[in-house]
Structures are given as structure tokens and as C-alpha cells.
């Protein structure tokens, strides 16, 4: 068994409570988590450090309403390419790509965010340089539920 599997098996209720509080609000400090859970603050701190060390917690970030900063066009792009390595490098460097997922059926699911539809279609034209076998894209009309798993 891998190290992360063993760590998961050792997860106790304290760790689960800490994770749920951080998923709900990553800016919550250890004292607040301690007060709300009844877990001693030193235990919260120690467990947090272990969760980071074992890469259970990998990053803290903020949710942004992209429309309020001028990015009005969001699209999910499904792509299958003969040039996977080059395509992935291009996507990794592209400033308008929020996330890339490796998926079945297609190679990648791309979460693309652009100021305008025109700029998005320029991006689609650029993708065709990577020997695309299959491409499908869908407009995001409304983001209804955002990062709610494991945060009760």
C-alpha cells in the first residue's frame, strides 16, 4: 500500500473535523477550529502539519467571481490529440486555462476562462495546431454548486 493510503486509513475524527472546517473556510485560524470542535489548539496545529506533510492539504486558495474582473466567458473543452505532450505544455502555460483534467474518452477536460467569446474562439483555433482528433466544447451558463464536497 502507498503512503497516502496508509495515512488515509489512520484518519481519525479530529482530522476529518479539521479538514471539514478548512474546506468550509480555509482562512479559519487554529483557535477558531479548536473552539468550534473542542479539539485542543495544539492538536489542531499538529494534525494540520501532518495533513500538509502527507499532502492531504495541498493548497489554500480563494474563489473569485471572474465576471466581476472582466472574464465573462467560461467554457469546458474536451479534447483528444495526437500531440498530448505538446498540448499539455501549451495548456499549462496558457494564462486563460483554469484547470486541466486527464479524462477517459477524450484526453483532457479544459476549464477555460476568457474575457470574450472572440478570444475563446481564437484559443480554439490555436488548439488545432496540436493535431486534434476530437474536440467538443460547452459554455458554462451558470456555476450552481462550487467546491461543496467534504465541507459540512
Residue ranges and their predicted role:
Residues 1-152:
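A compositional/biophysical signature of low hydrophobicity enriched in polar/charged and small residues
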